[in-house]
Amino acid sequence: MKKILLLVLLALLPFSVNAESKLNQILSSGELKVGTTGDWDPMSMKDPATNKYVGFDIDVMEELAKDMGVKVTFIPTEWKTIVSGITSGRYDVSTSVTKTAKRALVAGFTNSYYKYGTVPLVLKKNLKKFPTWESLNNEKVTIATTLGTSQEEKAKEFFPKSKLKSIESPARDFQEVLSGRADGHITSSTEANKLVITYPQLAIVKDGGKN
């Protein structure tokens, strides 16, 4: 199962020293800056009616700021820049970041507070054509991914024979499936369960989630 982690700036200095310095900086400024993509339902979404961020990650960060006695400011970012925004000092922390060896070289991670599996989504009308993960691993199949996400790397691992199509945010990979420009995409089981409700023409390939 994938782990949702709070990503904290520790840079390349000794972790304990740099973490303490960052904490003191946040407490001194009275502000916790949080990078969020606002495109991952139900963790972080931007409500068009209020122009405010909502979701589980948002609730966690608001409670963290409250416990620290500081205000929280949400900074918009993209998946491809979610780590560089921390190392450049644009914001202090980010959420819903999958831990990878590359990311761990430049940033620190807390313990996970949520776990999920990875599942494929296809058009419901194509479920008989694509009943399994392996049925999507075909040179005639196009798999859409969102640039900079962990799913982009996982798609290369899971579907080495398929054609991969990386989409720049704010566009999303599932939109390529809806439009027919891609046969499938992979996402967290959490988001997948929300997407099939919002877009009933989508369906989850049911032969099991992967890590």
Regions found by a protein language model. Give the residues of each.
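Sec-dependent N-terminal signal peptides
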Residues: 4-13
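Extracytoplasmic small-molecule ligand-binding "clamshell" domains
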Residues: 21-97, 105
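A structural signal for short loop-to-beta-strand junctions that line the ligand-binding cleft
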Residues: 23, 53-57, 104-116, 204-207
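Short helices/loops that flank or line small-molecule/ion binding pockets
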Residues: 66-67, 75-76, 80-92, 106-108, ...
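Short beta-strand-to-loop elements that line the ligand-binding cleft
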Residues: 71-78, 145, 162-170
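Periplasmic-binding protein-like
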Residues: 115-119, 189, 193-211
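Flexible hinge/capping segments at coil-to-helix
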Residues: 124-141
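Secondary-structure junction motif
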Residues: 143-159
